[in-house]
């Protein structure tokens, strides 16, 4: 695991995404995170009027990747593998926060997502009078988050 600098935070705009070893350029990544569900329990003859907090299942949010439309079918193929039953155990995904010099050898943080599957792919919006970049957005479900 790499060590973060303690003197100041890193900027959010230096990052890379790898899906099953293939690097992709994206404008935005959102949804990195994990949560542990907590259940409250109290039995009726408990002498204290407090509930017990018991940890439950781990949950992770879906990851959303946004980028300008590249004319590539890679994201579509990932979703198509899921639709046709060819996804197997899912892919691996790494999201790497890079330092200021964008050195490929030493990302400052790496989030590794396990058993990733594409769940949604959208294109657009398209507007004949618009001046924005045509976008594509992909949403991925995953089972586990590991911080490297």
Language model features by range: what are they?
Residues 1-148:
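Glycine-rich, low-complexity intrinsically disordered segments
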């Amino acid at each position: 695991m790499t060590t973060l600098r303690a003197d100041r935070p890193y900027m959010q705009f230096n990052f890379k995404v790898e899906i099953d070893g293939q690097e992709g350029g994206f404008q935005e990544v959102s949804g990195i995170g994990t949560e542990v569900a907590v259940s409250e329990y109290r039995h009726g003859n408990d002498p204290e009027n407090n509930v017990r907090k018991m940890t439950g299942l781990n949950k992770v949010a879906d990851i959303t990747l946004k980028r300008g439309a590249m004319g590539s079918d890679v994201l579509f193929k990932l979703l198509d593998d899921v639709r046709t039953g060819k996804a197997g155990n899912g892919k691996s995904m790494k999201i790497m926060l890079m330092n200021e010099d964008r050195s490929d050898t030493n990302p400052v943080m790496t989030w590794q997502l396990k058993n990733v599957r594409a769940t949604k792919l959208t294109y657009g919006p398209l507007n004949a009078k618009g001046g924005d970049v045509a976008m594509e957005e992909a949403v991925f479900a995953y089972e586990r988050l590991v911080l490297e």
